[in-house]
């Protein structure tokens, strides 16, 4: 059997997510994240942030967003910035929030560029 393609795993996870099958989505995202796919890690963080298919856990969300950001996933960086801005799952730290918003903006996440302009 061919080695799973992380991008395909994320796509399968998103299809499951769209069908509200969060448990199945989580499995795909976990596999993709394990293969160092930033989109998989970021999507896994989202499931934990909102308690979809898993028990809500903002600390775990922050860990997955952090890994996603390390893998240059713009949404992971932006989401991590938001957790730092509001002290959710991590200790509130506006300096770190600005850093992650800035990294997300540089990676093309337009919403974070707008957040930075408002600060």
Predicted regions and their residues:
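Terminal, low-structured helical/coil segments at or just beyond the last alpha-helical repeat
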Residues: 2, 105-119
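Hydrophobic face of amphipathic alpha-helices that form TPR/SEL1-like repeat modules
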Residues: 9-18, 43-50, 79-86, 115-119
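Repeat-mediated protein-protein interaction surfaces in helical alpha-solenoids
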Residues: 1, 23-28
């Amino acid at each position: 059997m061919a080695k799973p393609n992380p991008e395909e795993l994320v796509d399968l996870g998103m299809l499951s997510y769209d069908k509200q099958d969060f448990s199945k989505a989580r499995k795909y995202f976990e596999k993709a994240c394990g293969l160092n796919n930033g989109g998989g890690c970021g999507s896994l963080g989202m499931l934990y942030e909102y308690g979809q298919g898993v028990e809500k856990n903002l600390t775990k969300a922050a860990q997955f967003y952090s890994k996603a950001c390390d893998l240059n996933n713009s949404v992971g960086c932006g989401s991590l910035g938001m957790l730092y801005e509001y002290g959710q799952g991590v200790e509130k730290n506006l300096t770190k929030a600005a850093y992650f918003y800035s990294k997300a903006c540089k990676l093309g996440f337009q919403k974070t560029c707008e957040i930075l302009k408002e600060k």
